[in-house]
């Protein structure tokens, strides 16, 4: 969920990594369509779709929107859709505060593995440090 800057970067990275299917969701239809068009042009092998009717069969659900952050809607997807979330799905959220967002708490209660926003941010900081030369490449994995 979320097709802005963060969500776009995550979607692009997943497509570069070789996923075959990607479902996109954003509250703004124009933002969703722009990302869909860019991904379709660069990754024609990826089957793109809008919000699915079920989460059954998905390997990964990522919130790349501010949903769950203080002052924003608590869940990035409709509750009825989240009720279809299987325990085998990994759920990640980019929101850094609170550490465990309502989405992650819901997923954890369903038995899913989760990745918090701070965990995702730390991984990006290591990569950025390597990119600018502040962290030697060999230390990046252990840092």
Segments the model singles out, each with a brief description of its role:
Residues 1-15:
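Glycine-rich adenosine-cofactor-binding loop
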Residues 19-39:
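NAD(P)-binding Rossmann-fold cofactor-contacting core
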Residues 44-115:
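Rossmann-like adenosine-cofactor binding region
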Residues 97, 110-136:
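Active-site capping/gating segments
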Residues 139-143:
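A short, charged, Gly/Pro-tolerant segment at domain boundaries
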Residues 16-21, 110-112:
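Conserved S-adenosyl-L-methionine
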Residues 1, 25, 92:
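Active-site flanking residues adjacent to catalytic metal/cofactor-binding acidic residues
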């Amino acid at each position: 969920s979320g097709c802005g800057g963060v969500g776009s970067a995550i979607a692009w990275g997943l497509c570069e990594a070789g996923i075959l299917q990607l479902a996109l969701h954003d509250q703004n239809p124009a933002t969703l369509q722009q990302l869909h068009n860019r991904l379709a042009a660069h990754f024609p092998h990826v089957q793109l779709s809008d919000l699915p009717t079920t989460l059954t069969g998905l390997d990964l659900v990522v919130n790349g929107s501010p949903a769950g952050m203080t002052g924003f809607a608590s869940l990035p997807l409709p509750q009825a859709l989240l009720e279809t979330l299987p325990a085998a799905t990994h759920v990640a959220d980019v929101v850094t505060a609170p550490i465990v967002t309502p989405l992650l708490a819901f997923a954890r209660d369903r038995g899913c593995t989760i990745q918090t926003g701070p965990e995702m941010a730390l991984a990006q900081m290591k990569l950025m440090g390597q990119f600018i030369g502040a962290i030697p490449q060999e230390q990046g994995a252990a840092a």
